[in-house]
Amino acid sequence: GEYFVNYVKEHNDGKARVVELTNAVSTHCQERFVGLHEVIDAANADGCQIEILNKYDSQGNRETAYNAISAVVEPYDYVISDVDNGAMGAVSALQATGNTSVKVLSMGAYGQEPFGMLHNNDVNYLACLNVDAWVLAQFIFDGTISYFEGKDVPTQTNIDLFVVDNSNVEKFWSF
C-alpha cells in the first residue's frame, strides 16, 4: 500500500482512480485489501485523493479479470489485484485495447511471468508483492507434519513480503 501511495504522490500529484480485482472466496486475499484500504484511507486523510471506483471479483482467474477490466467504461488510472492471475488478465485486457497509461499492481506474485514483465519494463505492469511459493509450501509441509504428530498447528502464518518492481526484480529472479 505504501509503495502505491508514494507512486501516486510522485506520478499523479496524489490523485488516482482505482479498480480492484478481488478473490471474494479467499479470506487471505480479502485481508490484503483491508491493509491496502487502511493505507489509502490514511493517505486520503493526509490530502491525497485516491478513489476506489469499483471492485470486481476476478476469482483469481485471468479470463474473469480480463472481462471485468474490458467492461470498465469510466476513466481509471490503476488496477490493483490481490493475485497475479488477476493482474495478468488486467494487463492482457489493457494491451488488447492499446492502453499503455493504466498501471497494474499485484498484491501477490511469484515466478518468471510477472518478474519477466517487470524486468522487461512492461508498459502496464508496475509492481507486485513477492509471495514466494517455496516459503508457503514449507509452512504447509511443516504444519502437516505437526498435525500428524499431534502438535499444535498455528492458525495464522506470517511471511516476509517484498515489493518488487523494475528497480529490484533481479534480486528475486535470475534472468
What are these regions (language model features)?
Residues 3, 28-49, 64, 89, ...:
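Short, solvent-exposed amphipathic alpha-helices that sit
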Residues 15-18, 103:
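Residues that mark the start of a beta-strand
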Residues 17-20, 37-62, 160:
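Short beta-strand elements in bilobed, periplasmic/extracellular small-molecule ligand-binding domains
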Residues 119-130:
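Rossmann-fold dehydrogenase core element
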Residues 21-31, 81-85, 133:
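Extracytoplasmic "Venus flytrap"
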Residues 36, 54-116:
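Hydrophobic alpha-helical
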Residues 1-16, 65-66, 87, 110-115, ...:
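Hydrophobic alpha-helical segments within soluble ligand-binding/sensing domains
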Residues 131-175:
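Hinge/cleft segment of the Venus flytrap/periplasmic-binding protein
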